[in-house]
A protein has these predicted regions:
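Auxiliary alpha/beta "docking" domains used to position bulky ligands
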Residues: 1-153
Length: 153
């Protein structure tokens, strides 16, 4: 079974407006914006909490940090802007400080084709292939999908 799913999305206008306050120093509304989601299949259902879930989440968080830093570095070395959302804070990793956040259960993910389920006590993201057994990380860039950066990576 596949453990990593990397998807490249062209940001629709509505999503550009929704995320513009995440990047106050960038004009993401009027310029091209692509979103790369790294979806890692988890062993555990991420809708609940247990020591096993917490341990797996921490491991996947470290893997995402490593992958996101590498991909952002490659994009920047090719002349593109890129940043990723720190899943632990919901804020851009490299960007200017902002009070705006985007956690993995944010409604904005619906605009990328994910389901956000309200379980009453909390919300959880659901992937069409992995269901609730998923950890999702998000990278933003001004690189167009035709650059092939995701295919090479």
């Amino acid at each position: 079974m596949r453990r990593l799913n990397c998807e490249l999305h062209e940001a629709p206008s509505l999503l550009k407006r929704e995320v513009s306050s995440l990047f106050p120093d960038r004009d993401v509304i009027h310029k091209h914006l692509s979103i790369i989601t790294l979806c890692q299949k988890t062993t555990n259902d991420m809708s609940g909490w247990s020591n096993d879930v917490e341990k797996e989440r921490e491991e996947l968080l470290e893997q995402f940090y490593s992958a996101a830093k590498e991909l952002c570095g490659r994009l920047k070395s090719d002349g593109y802007w890129s940043d990723f959302i720190d899943p632990s804070s919901g804020k851009p990793y490299y960007g200017q400080y902002t009070n705006t956040t985007m956690f993995e259960t944010d409604e904005k993910y619906r605009l990328l084709g994910y389901r956000i389920e309200d379980l009453g006590c909390c919300k959880v993201i659901s992937h069409r292939e992995f269901g609730r057994n998923v950890f999702i990380g998000t990278i933003f860039t001004d690189a167009h999908p035709s650059t092939g950066i995701v295919q090479v990576w």
